[in-house]
């Protein structure tokens, strides 16, 4: 999930050993390891080998490039470096804001200087640094606090802080979990009866926009409820376009660009309001209610891992496995014997009912195509399922896989089908060629 952890401490404080002992190597980017990838140890004037610093420009450029790739996917990531200067930590702020991460600094400064000096001398020859460097970094770390936009923790606090725990939601009379809306406001308003109850919680599983024909009304509704404490918006794969729209960024979606965006433009929304709305989307809802534990994501997952923080946000949004995966039965099989219930949207290729498997509820009901808005409610009496028929949608030509008697498929028809397809985007090449 979207969590960045920066280790901070002078050489010899045990940062790399701590990573190894906590089995966190697979989540870690190490500046020293990248230095050794660029160049093997070099002989210094004392006749010993050490790690060259001459490639640091390339090293940090590569590290930030790899980090941004991870952050695009919402991966939990640790950076193993000294981070002695406050300015070094500040260098991550732009990415933290761009990808909506939480940033933590694990502070190793409680390790006594004498201990760090001793450990430094005991390290492999090429990993040792001069005592003067250890002294200077130690003093700088003590005199320059980490920036206020980070949360500072001690190494011994890590296991407790970095554990995504369920919250208790028993204070609510009822919990409504509402499936993919896809720009269909009328059917949503029909279910809500025009209002939200203050003592009830409303969780939206994502994909609020696209495909439907009432996108502007949906956005207006979201703007009206986004600050309510009893509303949780989950991020779906289509909802990233809302963030891009608010920041005037390029959106690589023909459906959004040709259908949704014109609706939003005509409505004249303030882009600042759109940006604030985009920041309200959550990655996951994990809670207990009564005797049961619930995990709600947009895409659906295969099991509840030991620590949800280690899951990439991209998997929470797009789901584990492919679109064709029957994730409901996969989850039920993997979670046999555990009192955990999954609720998700996004995919339902097999047209499963809302209660798709013993431990999994599927809220994808093709609402945008005249199907149903799917809802699950949870209260003291248990779980109830609902399907509300959507009668406000755009009728489109039959899919190309259908058989049309006396109808010939033309090039124009095929190209139009590709242009309107949700999962096909055009890439323009030189010479007027499109791919």
Residue ranges of each PLM-predicted region?
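Glycine-rich phosphate-binding P-loop
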Residues: 3-21
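Conserved GTP-binding G-domain of TRAFAC-class P-loop NTPases and closely related GTPase folds
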Residues: 4, 111-163
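Conserved substrate/cofactor phosphate-moiety recognition/catalytic segment
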Residues: 16-75
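Glycine-rich phosphate-binding loop used to anchor ATP phosphates in small-molecule kinases
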Residues: 54-104
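Conserved phosphate-donor/acceptor-positioning beta-strand/loop module used by diverse small-molecule
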Residues: 99-116
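Active-site neighborhood of divalent metal-dependent phosphoester bond hydrolases
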Residues: 125, 211-294, 302-303, 307-330
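N-terminal active-site segment of His-dependent metallophosphoesterases
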Residues: 155-221
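Acidic, His/Gly-rich catalytic cores of divalent-metal-dependent hydrolytic chemistry
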Residues: 329-432
């Amino acid at each position: 999930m979207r969590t960045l952890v920066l280790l901070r401490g002078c050489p010899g404080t045990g940062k790399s050993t701590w990573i190894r002992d906590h089995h966190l190597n697979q989540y870690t980017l190490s500046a020293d390891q990248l230095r050794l990838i660029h160049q093997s140890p070099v002989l210094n004037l004392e006749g010993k080998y050490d790690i060259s610093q001459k490639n640091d420009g390339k090293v940090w450029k590569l590290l930030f490039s790899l980090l941004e790739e991870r952050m695009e996917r919402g991966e939990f990531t640790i950076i193993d470096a000294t981070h002695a200067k406050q300015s070094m930590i500040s260098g991550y702020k732009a990415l933290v804001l761009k990808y909506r991460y939480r940033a933590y600094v694990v502070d190793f400064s409680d390790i006594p200087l004498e201990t760090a000096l001793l450990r430094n001398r005991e390290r492999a020859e090429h990993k040792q640094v001069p005592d003067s460097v250890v002294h200077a970094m130690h003093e700088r770390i003590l005199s320059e606090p980490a920036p206020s936009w980070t949360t500072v923790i001690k190494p011994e606090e890590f296991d407790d802080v970095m554990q995504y725990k369920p919250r208790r939601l028993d204070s609510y009379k009822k919990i409504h979990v509402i499936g993919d809306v896809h720009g269909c406001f009328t059917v949503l308003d029909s279910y809500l009866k025009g209002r939200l109850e203050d003592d009830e919680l409303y969780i939206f599983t994502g994909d609020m926009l696209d495909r439907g024909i009432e996108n502007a009304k949906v956005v207006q509704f979201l703007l009206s409820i986004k600050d309510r404490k009893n509303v949780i918006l989950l991020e779906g794969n289509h909802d990233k376009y809302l963030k891009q729209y608010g920041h005037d960024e390029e959106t690589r979606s023909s459906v959004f660009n040709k259908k949704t965006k014109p609706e939003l433009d005509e409505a004249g929304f303030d882009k600042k309001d759109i940006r604030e709305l985009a920041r309200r989307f959550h990655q996951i809802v994990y809670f207990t209610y009564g005797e049961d534990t619930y995990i709600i994501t947009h895409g659906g997952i295969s099991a509840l891992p030991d620590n949800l923080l280690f899951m990439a946000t991209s998997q929470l949004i797009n789901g584990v496995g492919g679109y064709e995966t029957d994730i409901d039965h996969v989850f039920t099989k993997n979670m046999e014997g555990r009192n955990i219930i999954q609720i998700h949207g996004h995919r339902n290729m097999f047209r499963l009912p809302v209660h798709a498997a013993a431990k999994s509820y599927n809220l994808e009901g093709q609402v945008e195509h005249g199907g149903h808005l799917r809802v699950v409610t949870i209260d003291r009496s248990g779980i109830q399922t609902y399907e509300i028929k959507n009668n406000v949608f755009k009728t489109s030509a039959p899919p190309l896989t259908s058989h049309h008697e006396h109808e010939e498929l033309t090039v124009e028809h095929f190209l139009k089908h590709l242009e309107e397809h949700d999962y096909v985007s055009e890439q323009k090449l030189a010479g007027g060629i499109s791919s």
